[in-house]
Amino acid sequence: MKLYLCIACCLLSLISSSQKVVDVDKTSGTAGNLFYAVGGEPYVNVKFVRLVSGSPYFKDQWMKGAATSAAGILFKSGIVKLDIMDNEVHFLDVAEKEMIVGLPLKDITLTDTLTGKSYHFVNTTYGFNYPSVKKGWYLQAASGAAGLYQYFIKQLRENRPFNSATTEQTIVTLEEFYILYKSNLVRVKKPKDVPLILSDKKAELEVYLKKLDAQKASNSEQLVALVTYYNSLLE
């Protein structure tokens, strides 16, 4: 009888030690390793073993990360990467093994430790849900009364070089921009579209756009500058 009791106690001890409970009331804004507590799955790179150029990630280097779950819980993770192609967040566990976050995330902020620059991404499935918009991670390029979001499209292309038995893979990155204004998310294809979308300041934006054209700024730079300028007019 004593033997059975000992076995039962051992089993209960093993079960208890294998479970990791996160106190929801105490997690917001605190510990740095909470992704470990909620678990994930190991990352196995079998998809891009023949990749010669391009990347499925927003940036290849590991960055500091902080994320909000779909349930509204703030998680601060140590080191993460954002996989744009598969809409996954990768992190390093305590043994520095690459893992995939297993819980739905609403948004994530990546910080480059070398430059100090931060990148805030919103998941359209949980952050703001618009039926006509492609699902995935959108980079917030400007915020305020009008928001500007950048959407990256990763396309995998395969090519077999002449006299080669191996097929090479290339990932090409395309991008789209969207303006969030008065609860409407509208795609903007060129800077000239911005004054038409943010029409209450149309005249001011058109004058500012001419200045940007004279400076020969890129389309993406002009879009960010125009939306930022619009928001400053409302302050």
Spans of model-derived segments:
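Bacterial Sec-dependent N-terminal signal peptides
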Residues: M1-D23, L226
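General N-terminal leader/first-domain-start detector
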Residues: L3, S18-S77
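Intrinsic-disorder/low-complexity, polar/charged segments
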Residues: V24-T27, G32, K190, S218-Q222
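Aromatic-patch recognition
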Residues: D60, G65-K192
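Long, compositionally biased interface segments
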Residues: L196-E235
